[in-house]
């Protein structure tokens, strides 16, 4: 691998053509499937033999449950708990995808705008449907802040509408950009270590190690940010704040 961006190349593992459309099973597909498999295996093993005194897996699952549940309660309220399964699935999928991408010779599917955009657009559509289902045409009121002078409507409504429609763009680009930039930085710094050799590469190696730890933190943080923004959008749809 010579180019820092070569690590993001999607490579077909099993070529599949359907009516002239390429739907091949790729390295990205494999990692997404692995992510789903790991998440399912974790929750299955954590909940299969529940005990009053929890073991390590059950404790981890309970901590994860409370973490996501508190995120929903704090940002949406108790009424948002009905969407807990979706929020939990979203967080675990993005979190594991980011973490698996940190492994050597792995693939970070969250570094592809197509994946993050699909997630963001799905969230946007779901939140919009929830908003209209709950409030009907009154949902349009969120584009005009309560208490604002009527004369400001021609200015505020377009601004609020553009802000609302840009949500899937900002949500997808934030995750995609952070994961892409972080991995490119790691690749470039790792290349310096190899070029400088054992002696000259001591300092760069320490830098790479520090950046790697930071990248793990960013990977976890981005999963949290992605999920909490989803909760905020959901709160807007439910409570119209």
From Swiss-Prot:
Subcellular location per the Swiss-Prot or TrEMBL entry: Cell inner membrane
Task: Quote the Gene3D superfamilies the UniProt record gives.
Answer: ATP synthase, F0 complex, subunit A
The entry describes its oligomerization and partners as:
F-type ATPases have 2 components, CF(1) - the catalytic core - and CF(0) - the membrane proton channel. CF(1) has five subunits: alpha(3), beta(3), gamma(1), delta(1), epsilon(1). CF(0) has four main subunits: a, b, b' and c.
Report a single Gene Ontology molecular function: proton-transporting ATP synthase activity, rotational mechanism
The record's annotation in Pfam families points to:
ATP-synt_A (PF00119)
Residue ranges annotated as transmembrane are 23-43, 83-103, 113-133, 188-208, 209-229
Q: Mind telling me which GO cellular component terms the entry cites?
A: plasma membrane; proton-transporting ATP synthase complex
Function according to Swiss-Prot or TrEMBL: Key component of the proton channel; it plays a direct role in the translocation of protons across the membrane.
Instruction: Report the protein name in the record.
Output: ATP synthase subunit a
Q: Which family, according to the similarity comment?
A: Belongs to the ATPase A chain family.
